[in-house]
Amino acid sequence: MSQISAKAVKELRDKTGVGMMDCKKALDESGGDMQKAVEYLRKKGAALAAKRAEREASEGVVIVKINDAADTGIILELNCETDFVARGDDFTGFADTIAQTALDGSVDSAEKMMGVSLGEAYDGEKVEDAIKTMTGKLGEKIQLKRLAYVRSEGGLVAGYVHPGSKLGSIVELSGGNSAEAVVLAKDIAMQVAAATPIVVDRSSVPAEYIEKEKEIYRQQALAQGKPEKFVDKIITGRLEKYFQEEVLLEQAYIKDSNTKVSDVLHEFTKQYDMPITVNSFIRYQLGA
């Protein structure tokens, strides 16, 4: 067996990011051939990925990317097994590259992203194979849990990631794409992340759901001995409370709890003569 130099081991480590001992073994197994050693490590990563496929990957990061025109964005969740790995440069850099590649290529799902090449930074590997390689490098199960692509025609897209990258959101608004509108959109994205709305406006709440909730409230009120003549008023009050908690436009604004989100949009329209409408939002929380 040929003698493996420390220089060759370092070169392989620089190329793959894998530990020194694993690089030494790969070169030993490959007779000192650098390309074969890289392939050996990739195969080892694939084998480890298969071995770890059933393991739980509940840590990771949420990444949001918005293009320079502020009309297109990507939000994704990439998982690993431990917070230690999730905070490392290798993992976060990998997640960032996937997000940027998805944004550049207008990829709209995690499934489609698996077949997309990550370019020279990852030796041209498709995401599916790069995940296996990264699994071998980091020693943990890696998975692209979900990914969404958002585009606005004539409006804007903005995002927010909470410090720690465990929570993020992306919103799409119509009505304008000024610098002031972008600032507002970012605040709305922060609102979505912090206040966990489930719909934009009350008209988006399914009628059958409202009827179901009304019946639950009715039965609760009657069970508590409330007079029949007051039950309808109680139901109305509880529904209003529900809307204030779950409907984005009716929530208290995170920057001013005395103002509703809808009021903020209305005031913006008056100030800048630019009607702004929130069309949609997506919120990712790690593991949720």
Curated annotation (Swiss-Prot):
Record's keyword annotation contains Metal-binding: no
InterPro entries (UniProt xref): EF-Ts_dimer_sf, Transl_elong_EFTs/EF1B, Transl_elong_EFTs/EF1B_dimer, Transl_elong_Ts_CS, UBA-like_sf
Gene3D superfamilies on file: 1.10.286.20, DNA helicase RuvA subunit, C-terminal domain, Elongation factor Ts, dimerisation domain
Record-linked PROSITE patterns: EF_TS_1, EF_TS_2
Region (Involved in Mg(2+) ion dislocation from EF-Tu): 82-85
Keyword annotations: Cytoplasm, Elongation factor, Protein biosynthesis
Molecular function terms from GO: translation elongation factor activity
Record-linked HAMAP family: EF_Ts (MF_00050)
Protein name (Swiss-Prot/TrEMBL): Elongation factor Ts
Natural source organism: Chlorobium phaeobacteroides (strain BS1)
Designated gene of the protein: tsf
